[in-house]
Amino acid sequence: MTNDSASHTPSDNTEMTEMQRYVTQQRGTEPAFSGKLLHNKRTGAYHCLCCQAPLFYSDSKYDSGCGWPSFDQPVSSEAVRYLEDESHNMRRIEIRCGQCDAHLGHVFPDGPKTTGERYCVNSASLSFIDDVDGERVDG
């Protein structure tokens, strides 16, 4: 496993916010409870902010109380890539977009009984697309 840095920008060539760039390109973490998509309860899919690849469905999102959007599984085994992360004197598993390698967050083995996994994802790395009206909301 490696710790390479991501180097992709949004596919529609819009400018990223400072936080979106910090999270997706520099493996940063947004402050807990600050993300735009944390409390989103609409039905739809969460996509990579940088390349718009689908990552998580809304029915896999749950409130873990950790301060970041949490999911119990990605849309497919290819949707995310896993890397060992030993930064900050911790041992964690980093998750990145399986298509463009943008940093998303981390996965932990303390999730719900369905999968046992908690995909802790920065809102700033996601775009949400509503199933009903097609509205896109960038985190």
From Swiss-Prot:
Cofactor detail note: Binds 1 zinc ion per subunit. The zinc ion is important for the structural integrity of the protein.
Record's keyword terms, sorted: Metal-binding, Oxidoreductase, Zinc
BP terms from Gene Ontology: protein repair; response to oxidative stress
Reactions this protein catalyses: L-methionyl-[protein] + [thioredoxin]-disulfide + H2O = L-methionyl-(R)-S-oxide-[protein] + [thioredoxin]-dithiol
Database matches in Pfam families: SelR (PF01641)
A single GO cellular-component term on record: cytoplasm
Cofactor: Zn(2+)
E.C. code: 1.8.4.12
Annotated binding of Zn(2+), by residue: 48, 51, 97, 100
GO molecular function, one term: zinc ion binding
Residue positions of the active site: 120
EC primary class: oxidoreductase
SUPFAM superfamilies per UniProt: Mss4-like (SSF51316)
InterPro entries the UniProt entry points to: Met_Sox_Rdtase_MsrB (IPR028427), Met_Sox_Rdtase_MsrB_dom (IPR002579), Mss4-like_sf (IPR011057)
MsrB domain segment(s): 9-131
Family to which this protein belongs: Belongs to the MsrB Met sulfoxide reductase family.
Database matches in NCBIfam families: peptide-methionine (R)-S-oxide reductase MsrB
Protein name per the record: Peptide methionine sulfoxide reductase MsrB
Gene that produces this protein: msrB
